[in-house]
Amino acid sequence: TNCKAISVRSIVQAGDFIAWLGENSVFAYDGTVKEIPCEVHDYIYNEMSELYRKSCWGGHNQNFNEIWWGFPSGDNQTTPNKYVIWNYRDNTWSIGELDRSCWVDQGAFDKPIAGDSSGFIYEHESGVLTGELDPFCQSGPLEIGQGDRLAQVNQIIPDEEANALPGLTISFTGKFTPLGTETDFGSFTFENDGYTDARFSARQVKMKVTRNSQQDFQLGQIRLDVKPRGKR
């Protein structure tokens, strides 16, 4: 099945199953070996150093139902500097950059402990970063059907809860061909009546939602009023 682990340290136990980074896929074993569909497959295996794959590590973050994997990116990177997180409860993926070389879940310690390539030890999931942050989430390219028609977006119908509305800003970019120039269609603020007017067209549309004030918020499903247009 070509499910060989990329390194011994990438094998992680999480409850009643284990998971690991294979040479070209992510796998899990709970009595049978399964290939795990991975939305960020290309991010892992296109970025990963061919020479230093053996330095990949994995760790369990049980409080959040997460498995973390660190890996080196680029030909000259000898130690892990990027990570991918699989939430096995929600089956969602996260990515990022972080210098970590090992991970120990909570147990002997109250919090997960991780070390970096310089020998420093960090307590994870402890406290918050200081200073203002701009959290956001961004979609991949959205298309109508097989991408053979242009999409005209006329209206945005958001679903948001915040202490003071509107708490979020939504922005769009688009392309008329996958390899074409990306066009910025600007930002839109969620209106209190639940409708935000817009008018732009593209074959591929990407959406980005950003918090615009320092407050808690929740984001539900965002609906778009989209009409198909011609093929050119």
How would you label these PLM feature ranges?
Residues 3-17, 23-232:
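Beta-sheet repeat architectures centered on beta-propellers
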